């Protein structure tokens, strides 16, 4: 049970990092135009 919670936390953390990275890249692309 504890391992499942840990896996869920890791997945959420990874998705958050990916979302922040994508958002940053999109802002950078829009700013360059």
UniProtKB/Swiss-Prot annotation:
InterPro entries: PetM_cyt_b6/f_cplx_su7. It comes from Cyanophora paradoxa. The 4 large subunits of the cytochrome b6-f complex are cytochrome b6, subunit IV (17 kDa polypeptide, PetD), cytochrome f and the Rieske protein, while the 4 small subunits are PetG, PetL, PetM and PetN. The complex functions as a dimer. Pfam families: PetM. The lineage of its organism: Eukaryota, Glaucocystophyceae, Cyanophoraceae, Cyanophora. GO terms for biological process: photosynthesis. It is found in: Plastid, Cyanelle thylakoid membrane. One of its GO terms (cellular component) is cytochrome b6f complex. GO terms for molecular function: electron transfer activity. It is a single-pass membrane protein. The keyword Transport applies. Coiled coil: none annotated. This is Cytochrome b6-f complex subunit 7. Belongs to the PetM family. The chain crosses the membrane at residues 9-29.
């Amino acid at each position: 049970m504890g391992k499942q919670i840990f896996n869920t936390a890791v997945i959420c953390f990874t998705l958050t990092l990916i979302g922040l990275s994508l958002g940053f890249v999109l802002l950078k692309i829009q700013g360059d135009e």
